UniProtKB/Swiss-Prot annotation:
UniProt keyword annotation of RNA-binding present: no
Record-linked PANTHER family: RIBULOSE BISPHOSPHATE CARBOXYLASE SMALL CHAIN 1, CHLOROPLASTIC, RIBULOSE BISPHOSPHATE CARBOXYLASE SMALL SUBUNIT, CHLOROPLASTIC 1
One Gene Ontology term, aspect cellular component: chloroplast
Species per Swiss-Prot/TrEMBL record: Acetabularia peniculus
Lineage: Eukaryota, Viridiplantae, Chlorophyta, Ulvophyceae, TCBD clade
Residue range covered by the transit peptide: 1-43
Record gene name: RBCS5
Protein name: Ribulose bisphosphate carboxylase small subunit, chloroplastic 5
Function as written in the Swiss-Prot or TrEMBL entry: RuBisCO catalyzes two reactions: the carboxylation of D-ribulose 1,5-bisphosphate, the primary event in carbon dioxide fixation, as well as the oxidative fragmentation of the pentose substrate. Both reactions occur simultaneously and in competition at the same active site. Although the small subunit is not catalytic it is essential for maximal activity.
Keyword Transit peptide attributed: yes
Family named by the database record: Belongs to the RuBisCO small chain family.
Keywords, ordered alphabetically: Calvin cycle, Carbon dioxide fixation, Chloroplast, Photorespiration, Photosynthesis, Plastid, Transit peptide
GO biological process terms on file: photorespiration; reductive pentose-phosphate cycle
Assembly with partners or alone: Heterohexadecamer of 8 large and 8 small subunits.
Length: 184
C-alpha cells in the first residue's frame, strides 16, 4: 500500500475537487541515466514565454497559415454551410486591452472580450464558392496591408461564431514567435 501511494499525487482542481493522478516515471537505462525519450519530454515541459507571444483564436499556436491551408479551411467552412466573414484591425487595436475595450459597468460580457474588429464588407451569406472568399481575403489584404485580418464563421442554426483565425498578419508584426521559441 505504501509503495502504491508513493507513485500517486493528489491534484486539486479549480473546482476544489481533489483527484489522484499517477506521477509519470522517467525511463532509465542500466546505468541509471534517463533515456533520450525522457530527456525530450522534459524539454517539452518548459516555461511559456510571456513576452511577444500573443495568440489569436483558432490555430494561433501554429505558424502562419499558407494560402493552400487557408483554402482548405474555407472549403471546410463552406462544406458545413457556415457563413464566412472577414474582419480587420490595426495592430494597436487587435489585442484586448484597457485602451481598446468597451467597458459597460463592472462586467460586460456581450462579446468575447468586448473588443470589436471592423468588418470587411458584409458577411458572405449563401456563399458556396471558396474562390470568392479567397478573393475577398486578397482584396482586404491589399486595402489594409498593415492590419491584422481574420476570417470568422458563423452557424446560422445555432447562432454562434464557430471559428476564427488569422489569414493575414502585418509584415511589421513582432508579436509572433516560432513554436520552438515559445518556451524558455
Amino acid at each position: 500500500m505504501a509503495a502504491a501511494m508513493m507513485n500517486k499525487t493528489i491534484v486539486v482542481s479549480k473546482d476544489g475537487c481533489a483527484r489522484s493522478s499517477s506521477i509519470p516515471k522517467v525511463a532509465t537505462n542500466k546505468m541509471g541515466f534517463a533515456s533520450a525519450v525522457a530527456m525530450k519530454k522534459s524539454r517539452e515541459m518548459m516555461v511559456w514565454q510571456p513576452f511577444n507571444n500573443k495568440m489569436f483564436e483558432t490555430f494561433s499556436y501554429l505558424p502562419p497559415l499558407t494560402d493552400e491551408q487557408i483554402s482548405k479551411q474555407v472549403d471546410y467552412i463552406l462544406a458545413n454551410s457556415w457563413t464566412p466573414c472577414l474582419e480587420f484591425a490595426a495592430s494597436d487595436q487587435a489585442y484586448a486591452g484597457n485602451e481598446n475595450c468597451i467597458r459597460m459597468g463592472p462586467v460586460a460580457s456581450t462579446y468575447q472580450d468586448n473588443r470589436y474588429w471592423t468588418m470587411w464588407k458584409l458577411p458572405m451569406f449563401g456563399c458556396t464558392d471558396g474562390s470568392q472568399v479567397l478573393s475577398e481575403i486578397q482584396a482586404c489584404t491589399k486595402a489594409f496591408p498593415d492590419a491584422y485580418i481574420r476570417l470568422v464563421c458563423f452557424d446560422a442554426n445555432r447562432q454562434v461564431q464557430i471559428s476564427g483565425f488569422l489569414v493575414h498578419r502585418p509584415p511589421t508584426a513582432t508579436d509572433y514567435r516560432l513554436p520552438a521559441d515559445r518556451q524558455v
